[in-house]
Swiss-Prot record:
It is found in: Cytoplasm. NCBIfam families: PRK05355.1 (NF003764), serC_1 (TIGR01364). It comes from Listeria innocua serovar 6a (strain ATCC BAA-680 / CLIP 11262). The gene is serC. Pathway: Amino-acid biosynthesis; L-serine biosynthesis; L-serine from 3-phospho-D-glycerate: step 2/3. This is Phosphoserine aminotransferase. Belongs to the class-V pyridoxal-phosphate-dependent aminotransferase family. SerC subfamily. GO terms for cellular component: cytoplasm. Pyridoxal 5'-phosphate binds at A76, S77, W101, T151, D170, Q193, N234, T235. The keyword Transferase applies. Homodimer. PROSITE patterns: AA_TRANSFER_CLASS_5. One of its GO terms (biological process) is pyridoxine biosynthetic process. HAMAP family: SerC_aminotrans_5.
Length: 363
């Protein structure tokens, strides 16, 4: 079956070579006569998989030795709770509010008993269309939480704030798509289903001195327990870890994160440049804050937006509908999304615009 152009914000497009390798190895991994889905997580075969995955992500992101790499479950949403539970330790937790997911992280942190939350900067006053300036954080705070890419609103934080306290980053929608210096962060977390692999896996990178600060946490929610058990306190999402390892190998073959970022910038520039010169489509995001991976755009009417999404779907451009809280359209151009798909989308946008400039709406 011919593949379509999948603009889903997550779960998202995976590299075709990875899917093909998964297909080849599905019934018998490494000559074992068993699928990866059937391997014991205590087996040597799976231990090699998770060890290789960790080694690759350390190489790709330049993760120092004094950081632990954890392959967990529960999505980035569980980290909204685990971070304050493990790191706040009676101190103030400081957050930057740049979008829907940041708001959820803030809301969850406020539910943790004994955690005082301060929102130090926000872009909500202009519908999260920009990245706010972040003031100096008091040294008595536990951490500063930021969201490096706002999937729904289409903004990104490329410059990590210098901070006297650990910076915690939700990188779910731009991890491995842009180069970041891991040493600037105390903790990084990301749901896998955008740039890493299938849903069900969460990557956590945490500096060792931040582990074990709080006693008596539930074992599954304790970074210390997870680190001491090599991400296998309970059965990890074995198949998702395996696919992530293959994705890491693919990224390495593309020239690493720097090579991927160069391609992502080229893809994003094509679409942004077209939108900028268009008198039919527009971007709701300030130019300096525009994401490379999630690009929202709108026409001048909800009726045209609806018609565009419907006709795009019929023409093989899937999952372009914007998030229900924002509307319009959103093209998610994650690492595995081909540049040919961007070029094809632009051609379709031009055709749609030319057919509608007389005001006709066909829904």
């Amino acid at each position: 079956m011919e593949r379509v152009y999948n603009f889903s914000a997550g779960p998202a497009v995976l590299p075709v070579p990875v899917l093909e390798k998964v297909q080849r190895e599905l019934l018998s991994y490494n000559g074992s006569g068993m699928s990866v889905m059937e391997l014991s997580h205590r087996s040597e075969l799976f231990q090699n998989i998770i060890d290789d995955a960790e080694s690759l992500i350390r190489e790709l992101m330049g993760i120092p030795e004094n950081y632990k790499v954890l392959f967990l479950q529960g999505g980035a949403s569980l980290q909204f709770d685990m971070v304050p539970m493990n790191l706040a330790n009676g101190k103030k937790a400081v957050y930057v509010n740049t979008g829907s997911w940041a708001k959820k992280a803030i809301s969850e942190a406020k539910k943790i008993q004994g955690v005082e939350v301060e929102v130090i900067a926000s872009s909500e006053d202009r519908n999260f269309s920009y990245i706010p300036e972040i003031p100096t954080v008091s040294t008595d705070a536990a951490y500063l939480h930021v969201t490096t890419n706002n999937t729904i609103e289409g903004t990104a934080m490329f410059d990590v704030p210098d901070s006297a306290v650990p910076v915690v980053a939700d990188m779910s929608s731009n991890i491995l798509s842009s180069v970041y210096d891991v040493k600037k962060f105390g903790l990084i977390y990301a749901g896998a289903q955008k740039n890493i692999g299938p849903a069900g896996l969460t990557l956590v990178i945490v500096r060792e001195d931040l582990i074990g600060q709080v006693e008596g946490l539930p074992s599954m929610l304790d970074f210390k327990v997870q680190a001491e058990n090599g991400s296998m306190y309970n059965t990890p999402p074995t198949f998702a870890v395996y696919v992530a390892k293959l994705v890491f190998e693919w990224i390495k073959e593309q020239g690493g994160v720097a090579g991927i970022e160069a391609l992502n910038r080229k893809k994003a520039a094509l679409l942004y440049d077209y939108i900028e010169q268009s008198d039919f489509f527009s971007s709701p995001v300030e130019p300096s804050a525009r994401s490379l991976t999630n690009i929202p755009f709108v026409t001048n009417s909800a009726e045209f937006d609806k018609a565009f999404v419907k006709e795009a779907e019929a023409n093989g451009f899937k999952n372009l509908k914007g998030h229900r809280s924002v509307g319009g359209m959103r093209a998610s151009l994650y690492n595995a999304f081909p540049i040919e798909g961007v070029e094809a989308l632009i051609a379709f946008m031009e055709k749609f615009a030319n057919a509608r400039k007389g005001g006709e709406v066909r829904v």
